[in-house]
Amino acid sequence: MFNTSTFVYIATTADTKGQELEYVRQIIANLGLPTVTVDLSTSSLPANPAADICAEEVAGYHPEGARAVFCPNRSHAITAMALAFERFLLTRHDIAALLGLGGSGGTAIITPAMQKLPIGLPKLMVSSMAAGDVSVYVGNSDIAMLYSVTDIAGLNRISRRVLSNAACQIAGAVRFATAHDIEEKPAVGLTMFGVTTPCIKMVVSALEPQWDCLVFHATGSGGRALEKLIDSRLLSAALDLTTTEVADYLFGGVLPCNEERFSAIARTGIPCILSCGALDMINFGPPETVPARYAERLIHQHNPQVTLVRTTPQENASIGRWIGEKMNACSGEVRFVIPGGGVSALDAPGQPFWDPQALAAFMQALESTLRPTNKRRLIKTAYHINDPRFAHIVTEQFQHIANPRLLSK
């Protein structure tokens, strides 16, 4: 059921896209939904009458005032308006959905603010930039990107169809939103890769009766999404068992985390179990994309689009030290559980990445770096990460540090 006290916000640079703004506004209004239109123009032209909220009002939310937005440097103006729009949106408590229309500049202004909106609130960006790599625009959010096909520069037979579809999509997301019951179980985030899937499935199966289990694909963006939800207090605990993104970050893979990995756990103090899932590999695309410096290394083609380079003992030691320092910043309950029998499906006897020396180097570096406390501990096992006995130990340790009855309150 639609909340009549909320509005579909429509944002664009109305100095160049006022016609398109009015077109989608009218469609949404005809579908029975109230709208608020927002002008994000960075030119110094007079206020556009097509918008309910003028660019000057939005620009006033910049920490340095509107003058920071309306400046001669277009790049600076776009960056400043993006910050102003982000701060403007955070003051609005009547947003049912956000529809953005933009080219490169408009998309750069609108999407950072979209990323700050709650996950689950409909957000759709119609953009001429949506046919390429949109990761910088989407970030860790659930923004939907719709390619405009033609530039958003007037109404024509193509743009009318695309914009009409966008208006109907955002209206449908609002009008036909599914009612969600309040989830009484606390939420826990888990990280998984294909080569650690058996472990995660066993842990999820054991925890599901008491926990709402959210599994994140450890592809760089997955880890960042996990961290965002931890910082947003939408997760009560974490089982970050697949930390492969660290290898890509340190050694140039294509699925890296960033320097902030594990920092949300330290900031919030939520209970967490860590492990070294899939730290035996650095991820690349097709074989021809593997850097020349890795040409003589042990390489495994996982599928036509994914090529894996085996990490060396020296690299694993570097990873161990890096994670150890991150753990030292944690003041909450945190455990690192070592799967001494191998860290992935490929790191097992008879498999291509089996290398006990590499795992030993990781363990030694982690242990020598970590400063244990009564809350921060290292736990060694002899089992492979996908062994049911390892999953049992992980689950048991988690249950020691995370009480779902307390965390659900």
Swiss-Prot record:
Family affiliation: Belongs to the UPF0261 family.
Pfam families in the cross-refs: UPF0261, UPF0261_C
Lineage, broadest ranks: Bacteria, Pseudomonadati, Pseudomonadota, Gammaproteobacteria, Enterobacterales
Gene3D superfamilies linked: Uncharacterised protein family UPF0261, NC domain (3.40.50.12030), Uncharacterised protein family UPF0261, NN domain (3.40.50.12020)
Matching NCBIfam families: PRK02399.1-1, PRK02399.1-2
UniProt superkingdom: Bacteria
Protein name: UPF0261 protein Spro_4740
InterPro entries: Tobamovirus_resist_UPF0261, UPF0261, UPF0261_C, UPF0261_N
